[in-house]
Amino acid sequence: MLTASLYKQLPVLTTTATSTYSFIRLSSTLATPPHSTTTTSPSSPAFHQPNHPQQFANPNTSVFDVSTRIYTQEGIDNNNDTKFLTKAPYPHPVFPQDECENVTVTHRETKTLGDKISFRSIQFMRQCFDLVTGYAVPKTNNPDEFKGTRWEMTEGKWLTRCIFLESVAGVPGSVAGFLRHLHSLRMLRRDKAWIETLLDEAYNERMHLLTFIKIGKPSWFTRSIIYVGQGVFTNVFFLLYLLNPRYCHRFVGYLEEEAVRTYSHLLDELAVPGKLPAFETMKIPEVAVQYWPELTPKSSFKDLILRIRADEAKHREVNHTFANLEQKTDRNPFALKIEGLNKPQPNHGINVMRPTGWEKQDLQL
């Protein structure tokens, strides 16, 4: 016979066992997809998540790697966004192939204290950026000088550098255009076409960025740097433009000099067969074909970089010229072509271009 104490404990044991069994059955039910009568093995296609690993040309990177994952041609085609496309508010001028190839690396010598501060600031920013991204210009003509070291530039590192550069370069034009817009409203007078060119510049830089992100997927580490960097740089540039817009334009002129130098280095590496194989066979994304009038679906990555470098060279000329002008009274010489002049004047193209900027005495203002 059962004792009274043992008899009282039996329901407790039974209840605990029943609850445990029910919990196990519930867990098993939740772990099994509803209305599923087949067993899924790790080797079956349904087991794997649809992350499309075949769309990337380079393998997975480490968590803190700044390299961008390059899409295969299939990945680029799948990422083309052709829905609800609108015409560009600032149509891109035609840049002939020979004029794009004739763009050179130049430097405007510093003349004033403001010039020196602007130039040194750019050099400091570049050195920090080079250190983080593992970038270095070869000191010799040997393209394999840094092969096997952290300074070797791969397709992923090149694209990271381009993406970060364009995310920064798109800020000054929009900030300067916004502040000049407010100034025009506040002072109840014309801006003399500075705003249009500045916003065109910002739009152009953003199109560079939108093109690059169709070619590769930045790492989360790169995205975090861009997120923080944009917040800091935008606010600092905003305050400095209020204080001294002339030297802010000089700063951007030197920034564009570095952009031209970077893209020229990239073009040099593209000229070496087998150096950047993923870029050699790549067809450009649809957004580039829609924006640059000379590009076609058959254009190469090199054709794209030639146009982007030409854009940066134009921004270099524009900002160095703006820094030479009277900020509140002079007109924008790039906005209007004056007929009947017997001397060259700035225009939207790159056929008549002064890389270090136009001096004020040479302009019809």
Swiss-Prot record:
Fe cation binds at residues 166, 205, 208, 257, 312, 315. The keyword Membrane applies. The keyword Cell membrane does not apply. Disulfide bonds: none annotated. Its cofactor is Fe cation. GO terms for cellular component: mitochondrial inner membrane. Fe cation 1 binds at residues 166, 205, 208, 312. Catalyzes cyanide-resistant oxygen consumption. May increase respiration when the cytochrome respiratory pathway is restricted, or in response to low temperatures. This is Alternative oxidase 2, mitochondrial.
